[in-house]
């Protein structure tokens, strides 16, 4: 065993193997360009633009903010205890958005649902149901992925739209069930 180890060590450390290994390593090292570090330009507080404005180069982006105003419309939550009265017994069609706090696409579509709730005020009610807190209702209606938007009318599930879809897709679904 010791002689086999010595033989393999002798083969690995032969001058010919070392010379060819160091030559190929040197070739590989020369192929990598030297690092110049990471460069960045900090945003000025009074500027709405990132990056070099004159150059109009890559990575420039616009940063928008509304100061002192919350422009989003909060969609009320429905729970297991309020489901019957708010959704099943509603006189108007109801759009229910199934969501979870950890779901990125749910956060993307939430402002769209808020906007639609304002546009269809008096014709449609909009609620959201947290599937983590109310798994019974989600499984009762076959929700397998979120976000899922369901439309209920007269206590019956009428339509479902799955995913963070464009506003026009939700409008097309809503228009089938609202009074004109």
Swiss-Prot record:
Top-level taxon of origin: Eukaryota
Annotated positions for site Contributes to redox potential value: 104-105
This protein's UniProt keywords: Chloroplast, Disulfide bond, Electron transport, Plastid, Redox-active center, Transit peptide, Transport
Any one GO molecular-function label of the UniProt entry: protein-disulfide reductase activity
InterPro entries documented for this protein: Thioredoxin, Thioredoxin-like_sf, Thioredoxin_CS, Thioredoxin_domain
Region forming the signal peptide: none
Domain Thioredoxin: 65-179
Main localization (coarse): plastid
Active-site feature positions: 103, 106
Disulfide bonds: 103-106
Location(s), subcellular: Plastid, Chloroplast
Transit peptide: 1-64
GO-annotated cellular components: chloroplast; cytoplasm
Function as written in the Swiss-Prot or TrEMBL entry: Probable thiol-disulfide oxidoreductase that may be involved in the redox regulation of chloroplastic enzymes.
Protein family per UniProt: Belongs to the thioredoxin family. Plant M-type subfamily.
UniProt name for this protein: Thioredoxin M2, chloroplastic
């Amino acid at each position: 065993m010791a002689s086999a180890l010595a033989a393999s060590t002798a083969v690995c450390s032969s001058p010919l193997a070392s010379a060819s290994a160091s030559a190929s390593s040197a070739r590989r090292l020369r192929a990598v360009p030297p690092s110049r570090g990471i460069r960045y330009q900090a945003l000025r507080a009074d500027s709405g633009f990132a990056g070099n404005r004159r150059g109009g180069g890559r990575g420039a982006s616009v940063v928008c903010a509304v100061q002192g105003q919350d422009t989003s419309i909060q969609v009320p939550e429905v729970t297991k205890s309020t489901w019957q009265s708010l959704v099943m017994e509603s006189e108007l069609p109801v759009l229910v958005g199934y969501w979870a706090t950890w779901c990125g696409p749910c956060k993307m579509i939430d402002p769209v649902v808020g906007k639609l709730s304002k546009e269809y005020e008096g014709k449609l009610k909009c609620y959201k149901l947290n599937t983590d807190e109310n798994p019974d209702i989600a499984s009762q209606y076959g929700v397998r992925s979120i976000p899922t938007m369901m439309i209920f009318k007269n206590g019956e599930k009428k339509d479902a739209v799955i995913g963070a879809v464009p506003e026009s897709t939700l409008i097309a679904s809503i228009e089938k069930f609202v009074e004109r």
